[in-house]
Amino acid sequence: MPQLITYGNELIRINPANNRIEYSTNRGISWMSRYSGSSCGTFRDLLPYNGKIIAVTDKGVYYSSNKGISWMSRNTSSQAKTFIAIQDAGRELLAQTNDGHLYYSTNEGISWMRRR
């Protein structure tokens, strides 16, 4: 599923055709590649959060502090690999899994607990 976020004065998106992180500075008229690596896995969702971009991939949760140029692992546990969507819920992050479970994090995605 393609994901598009606003980050500063840019639009940033996942291009599902080639798994690239792309950006636009002209409201989406043209797009430039920002990240085309494969070490993070397949990107599923993006979230601007506390001055960073948090990404959910098939390898876990990653973050970027430089607009998506590079990515650092945040959590690569087996449960994080099933996340398909991430949401800012104020004092916590929420992540939905591919089997319908909901997880929450109170430490910017470092650890996750299943919501009962």
Regions found by a protein language model. Name each.
Residues 1-8, 40-49, 80-89:
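Repeated scaffold domains used in trafficking and secretory/extracellular systems
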Residues 4-13, 51-55, 90-95:
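Entry beta-strands of beta-propeller and related beta-repeat scaffolds
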Residues 17-21, 59-62, 99-102:
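Loop/turn residues immediately N-terminal
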Residues 18, 28-29, 68-69, 109:
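Short coil turn/linker residues within repeat-based beta-strand modules
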Residues 24-25, 64-65, 105-106:
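Conserved Ser/Thr-centered positions that define the repeating blades of beta-propeller domains
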Residues 31-32, 71-72, 112-113:
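Tryptophan-centered short beta-strand motifs
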Residues 35-38, 75-78:
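Surface loop/turn motifs at the tips and blade-to-blade linkers of beta-strand repeat domains
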Residues 100-116:
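Blade-level signature of beta-propeller repeat domains, shared across WD40, Kelch, NHL, RCC1
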